[in-house]
């Protein structure tokens, strides 16, 4: 074990050479500065996220002055006890949320009456009953004094993922919203969407999650698709008309900040990538990022890696061999070989293309034909670009594009199926594309796994790799195959959905828990790897199971 004083000295040294990195946000306590660096690098908390979620007892200026006095008084020879006392004197672990039961919660939604299988019906009801345990509302004190917290306060109650994720997250919310709508909780969904829209109005985009230290990045752009789910379920055109401009604003963030040129066969295309320009460690994983970057001596190399780490976090896949690029374009290496920003992700562009389509339809319905035309033109451009850049005719599937080597990354990832899920292709080709995708899936030996579809075939120890199966990835593949129009693909989707529901039910019966990810080799067993222990709850897991039950187990 490294002696505490040596850890402190290391912390001070690293800070001196890292001071020029762009911060994660403006806060000199939660996102940048010596206080954050010393506390996180001293490892007085096992989880880096713990410190940046503490409440500041005083205002920021007083807290920083107290820290300067602390450094002077201890003459930079502080002990662990000294630092822990400083933190306890200036910060407080406080629940930022109050108990809240959604007013529209019912333990007997209409979905249950359409499920014939008694076992599946009971499972669905058990999942519905979990929603109140994941329901949160921000305390009035946080709303009144937000400067003392890292939380981004919102007015309405919401559903969290669960476990260490005590605030709402962007892309998790898509499958949570789907599950809530299937649970007849329309008001709760409207409140969650209003929360997101208020964030867009304030910041111009939706950050990774509801913390100031997430303001350096977003997550997969699914707001418009959440709105589509809500409007389809409620036909709430008054709400849509009121909020259409803000929905538009969120998509334009991606157009204005995440597009790059892609050259293939001499033709230039514009496509999106995940790209955070913040070249400093993630505050919630500060120690881990500094450690990962310690292999580099040049501060510019460290800053580049920090940007790639944050860009990978923006993708939602933090972390995966998907973003690791070796000298040959393969996936050999560790997180220090992360090159997220050279990769053009097929799923991101599929999500955007579908969002453009939905937004165009919204404008059309509301009678705003110029805006409807603007977005429908983008749909055609993106469909063509996805086909020309991402689709591999030899393999019958879409791939990420390596924008430096100008080649497909021909590895198995569930994201390869995202264009099927998003239906971002000429509808006349749906059946053949579904048939080809099903063939690709089978030739990759994916039917060998009864605990779910693996996130990759790489054994890296990262959580978005083998042997983990993630709920949203199951949804993208299963629902994509089912919507394709190919009979073979639809049959495959039904079997995969049956396996996933069965595996989740096994785990639920054994533990009473729903997990954020599962092990493909052992049906029902939770997954592992990554920077934290597996979490239970779990918002998107419950949403995906309810989605599959609704699609494949109802009359």
UniProtKB/Swiss-Prot annotation:
The active site is at 318 (proton donor/acceptor), 516 (proton donor/acceptor). It catalyses: alpha,alpha-trehalose + H2O = alpha-D-glucose + beta-D-glucose. Coiled coil: none annotated. The keyword Manganese does not apply. It is found in: Secreted. Its EC number is 3.2.1.28. Glycans are attached at residues 46, 216, 334, 371. It holds the Pfam family Trehalase. The keyword Hydrolase applies. GO terms for biological process: trehalose catabolic process. Substrate binds at residues 164, 171-172, 208, 217-219, 282-284, 316, 531. InterPro entries: 6-hairpin_glycosidase_sf, 6hp_glycosidase-like_sf, Glyco_hydro_37, Glyco_hydro_37_CS. GO terms for molecular function: alpha,alpha-trehalase activity. It is an enzyme of class 3 (hydrolase). Bean-shaped accessory glands (bags). Induction: It is increased from 1 to 2 days after adult ecdysis, but decreased after 4 days. It is dependent on ecdysteroid hormone during pupal stage. PROSITE patterns: TREHALASE_1 (PS00927), TREHALASE_2 (PS00928). GO terms for cellular component: extracellular region. Its main location: secreted. SUPFAM superfamilies: Six-hairpin glycosidases. It comes from the Eukaryota. Disulfide bonds: none annotated. Keywords: Glycoprotein, Glycosidase, Hydrolase, Secreted, Signal. Residues 1-16 form the signal peptide. Belongs to the glycosyl hydrolase 37 family. This is Trehalase. It comes from Tenebrio molitor (Yellow mealworm beetle).
């Amino acid at each position: 074990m490294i002696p505490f004083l040596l850890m402190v000295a290391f912390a001070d040294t690293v800070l001196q050479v890292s001071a020029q990195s762009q911060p994660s946000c403006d806060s000199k306590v939660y996102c940048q500065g010596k206080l954050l660096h010393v506390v996180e690098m001293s490892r007085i908390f096992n989880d880096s996220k713990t410190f940046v979620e503490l409440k500041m007892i005083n205002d920021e200026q007083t807290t920083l002055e107290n820290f300067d006095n602390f450094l002077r008084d201890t003459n930079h020879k502080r002990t662990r006890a000294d630092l822990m006392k400083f933190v306890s004197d200036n910060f407080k672990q406080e629940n930022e949320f109050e108990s809240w039961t959604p007013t529209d919660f019912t333990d007997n939604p209409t979905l249950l009456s359409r499920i014939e299988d008694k076992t599946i019906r009971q499972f669905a009801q058990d999942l519905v009953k979990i929603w109140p345990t994941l329901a949160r509302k921000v305390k009035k004190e946080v709303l009144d004094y937000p400067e003392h917290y890292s939380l981004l306060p919102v007015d309405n109650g919401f559903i969290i993922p669960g476990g260490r994720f005590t605030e709402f997250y962007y892309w998790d919310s898509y499958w949570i919203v789907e599950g809530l709508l299937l649970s007849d909780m329309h008001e709760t969904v409207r409140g969650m969407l209003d929360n997101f829209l208020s964030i867009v109005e304030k910041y111009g985009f939706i950050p990774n999650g509801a913390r100031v230290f997430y303001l350096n990045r977003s997550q997969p752009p699914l707001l418009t698709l959440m709105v589509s789910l809500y409007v389809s379920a409620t036909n709430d055109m008054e709400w849509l008309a009121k909020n259409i401009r803000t929905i538009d604003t969120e998509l334009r963030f991606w157009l204005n900040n995440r597009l790059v040129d892609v050259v293939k066969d001499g033709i230039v295309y514009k496509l999106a990538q995940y790209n955070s320009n913040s070249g400093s460690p993630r505050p919630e994983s500060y120690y881990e990022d500094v450690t990962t970057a310690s292999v580099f001596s040049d501060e510019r190399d460290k800053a580049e890696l920090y940007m790639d780490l944050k860009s990978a976090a923006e993708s939602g896949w933090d972390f995966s061999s998907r973003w690791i690029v070796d000298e040959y374009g393969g996936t050999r290496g560790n997180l220090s070989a992360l090159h997220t920003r050279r990769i053009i992700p097929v799923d991101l562009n599929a999500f955007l293309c579908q969002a453009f389509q939905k937004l165009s339809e919204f404008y059309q319905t509301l009678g705003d034909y110029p805006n409807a035309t603007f977005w429908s033109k983008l749909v055609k451009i993106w469909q063509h670009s996805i086909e020309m850049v991402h689709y591999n005719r030899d393999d019958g599937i879409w791939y990420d594009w390596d924008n430096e080597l100008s080649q497909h990354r021909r590895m198995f990832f569930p994201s390869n199926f995202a264009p099927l899920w998003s239906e971002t292709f000429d509808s006349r080709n749906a059946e053949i594309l579904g048939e080809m995708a099903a063939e690709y899936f089978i030739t990759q030996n994916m039917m060998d796994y009864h605990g779910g579809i693996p996130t990759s075939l790489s054994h890296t120890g990262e959580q978005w790799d083998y042997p983990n199966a993630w709920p949203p990835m199951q949804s993208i593949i299963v629902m994509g195959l089912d919507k394709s129009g190919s009979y073979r693909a639809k049959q495959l989707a039904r079997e995969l959905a049956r396996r996933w529901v069965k595996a989740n039910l096994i785990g639920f019966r054994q533990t009473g828990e729903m997990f954020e990810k599962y092990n493909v080799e052992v049906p029902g067993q939770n997954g592992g790897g990554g920077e934290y222990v597996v979490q239970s709850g779990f918002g998107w897991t419950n949403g995906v199971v309810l989605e599959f039950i609704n699609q494949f187990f109802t009359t």
